[in-house]
Amino acid sequence: GGAFAVFYLTVAIAFHYYHIFSQTMAFIILIGVTVFMSVLSVVYNRRELAIISLVGGFLAPFIVSSGEGSYLVLFTYVSILNLGMFGLSIYKKWGELPMISFVFTWLIMGIFLLFSYTSSSTVISGHLFLFTTLFYFIFLLPVFSILRGEDMRTKSRGLVFVIITNNFIYLLSGALF
């Protein structure tokens, strides 16, 4: 896991300081590292590697950011990352992945809303509402998965947290947009 963190840092330095890669190439390299780490986590059954991969995946757009990126690209990438996380969490039954993804996704959305969003554009508001709707349904998928499982007693607190928080955030975004 630590070697991959160093690799993320190496790509960031190569992009920002030495301009060895273009922004697109650096981002593609980081996506490749994230996918490779996810595959290794499945092959070696290493939950902690999947967590590092997920966190690295969420940090990748910011590692190669020049401050002028598209919110559409960012939230599309986050949506794809969340769907991949959901597939991995179902396949390996790693319930903490959706929780980590949930926190990072809404944190990224919240930071974007605080620092980059202006309500003057109805097009941007429409896009953001579509993404919050997509995120809402993505984070309902693990809930349905848990409900289908046998051992719900151990997961009930996390389930209640996700349901309440997800509904509250979606309600808030509906009022905002």
Task: Mark where each language-model region is.
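Alpha-helical multi-pass membrane segments and their bilayer interfacial helix-loop junctions
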Residues: 1-177
